[in-house]
């Protein structure tokens, strides 16, 4: 194995001349469109998307999970893996933690002090926390089988609330600034739950969590149209989510997971409405074909990802007060090296962001005012079809990253090295990580 830095240096040296040629060609193209390529490189350099701690391990399905070599066994090892991704792509300096999977130990390796030290050494920070009340944990007094924050039994709801408060405390110790709540509460059969009462209990539980938020924190909630409950999910669409957030409190905002919608829903229109309502908190980026597939971002529907960023960039350029969405990848890497998937996904998200900055906003506004549907689509497609790869690579190089992150990663031999140091994890039946 060679170090990541050595791999980047060697691989970049072999690719630099080609990058310079491609960059110069794109620069001339963009000049004809009166676009400053250096400004786009600066935007790509400044873009940030967080990595989920659970994303560096192998995912799975409800049928099976097939462990990969060198999977991280502890939070410290997850930090090491996230550090590798960041060293190569340079847009992922923050992590999101899931409790209790990432709960710090009381003392020794894995305690708060050692976690903070490892984060500092890897150039990372903790951005957000995530609670888990969709699984029962060993030794847990009460079960979430029939719900958590919306359970009919107050004692179960109180247990779920206390778990979220624990997440806030851990996050405060580690420097986080937001907390995300997703629940699997719902029903599999008609009549199983009382729809209105369940929402009432949900809002009441969230209000208790919202009241305990540390200063400067935001609370994100996300809906899901189905799964794990299949007849009804308590928080089943974006409208219900928005109304609940409004009831909960000013710092409760909507988080959009691209896979949590019904098939063919116009997600970019939902994003636009949340921006208008000043209710957009952030994103969990992934891709899907049929449901909440959690595939690599941009792998199936890259144009949809671009259209989402078209709305986000439009709001950014307009300077809408309070517009500061948090971006994170949320994926399940079942058949790939998770670090490679995270690198590719991060690059695809930045790609969509930069492409959205290529949209001729004045021309688009004119086409919309004139009801010129064909011209409007042409303007969007012109931006989407522009290959901005040289811009993304130049931004990475500027920050010390790799021209081709996956190639440099493979050349380093990192996966084989950690595989020899980390014993294989047993396959779990649930496929959940």
How would you name each of these model-derived features?
Residues 1-60, 64-66, 76-77, 83, ...:
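Histidine-acidic metal/acid-base catalytic patches
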Residues 31-37, 78-82, 108-119, 165:
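Short alpha-helical segments and helix-capping/turn motifs at coil-helix boundaries
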Residues 38, 43-55, 89-90, 102-139:
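Glycine-rich, aromatic-flanked loop segments that form ligand/cofactor-binding clefts
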Residues 59-66, 103-111, 137-158, 183-196:
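Surface-exposed, active-site-proximal loop segments in enzymatic domains
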Residues 75-78, 90-101:
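Active-site loop/lid in soluble adenylation, ligation, and acyl-transfer enzymes
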Residues 94-97, 126-131, 175-183, 217-222, ...:
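Short beta-strand segments at enzyme active-site cores
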Residues 115-119, 152-178, 198-213:
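An active-site-proximal structural segment forming one wall of the substrate-binding cleft
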Residues 144-149, 181-198, 219-233, 290-291, ...:
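Active-site-proximal beta-alpha loop/turn segments in soluble metabolic enzymes
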